[in-house]
Amino acid sequence: MSTAIAWIEGQWGTAASLQLPLNDRALLLADGLFETVLIRNAEPQLLEEHLQRWSDSAALLGMDQPPQRDALKPLIEGAIQRSQLSEADGALRLNWSRGSSPQRGIGLPAPGHHRFWLTLQATTPTFSAVTTITQSA
């Protein structure tokens, strides 16, 4: 049996037990980005590609670079171990926020206040095709 796990600012716990400041710009203004990585047989799938897109997205948004592979690898391994995902599939979500800002408004805060957190929980991936309906003007 697996357990959902989370990490933020050096602390492990559950997503419900850990705290994210309510003035974090990711919560207030959607000022951040994320990557969701499939964990299969205790291994992250396409991790290099996900991390490259994560890094490229941060640059496109003018954000500091998110944590890179060397810093993430022990955290990802720790999350897999703590969640007891061995044969179950999991969804690892890597979150990168511009961080908290003492002032209100959409003006960008000074660099260096970014925040990273991750969550991992068991999932059943869907690989079937999805149809979307669009309306043309």
Describe the role of every protein-language-model region.
Residues M1-A137:
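Conserved alpha/beta cores of soluble small-molecule-handling proteins
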